């Protein structure tokens, strides 16, 4: 609602919610890893053959959203709003409802990711997902999603995720520290955004 009704920039709204949630978590846990994880969440550490449970969930969600975005009216409306919200509004689409639906879906995916990550590490800690926000932005941008919206696709994002994961694995294998990893990922995002801007100018 902050974004659709109050016209707050999405990035600003995301940062606001990030600070609010982190503050509430800090107050609840007092900065100390605490709580317990139900034994049922231990399933995320299991695997079926060479596929781990989180990887299977990732494949399943990719398949579901690929069908949703490419083969349903809702998906076409999402792309229409993303490409040109004003044109979509003039064509009779409820831009506000579509945006709200997309943010709800994104929140559900964040919850699923949080549950899986919590089950994986086995405790609650405010620093548990530090750096994953940068990874998600990097994967989307590297995969071809325009930083300011209006362009992108699921297949490109999947490719971006694989590229960032390969990059992270290489950094670990090279024995580089966490600070260097952040620097490299930041440079990757900068390069991707710069290349996109250059391509737009040439077009």
What are these regions (language model features)?
Residues 6-74, 98-101, 120-129, 180:
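Transmembrane helix-bundle core of multi-pass membrane transporters
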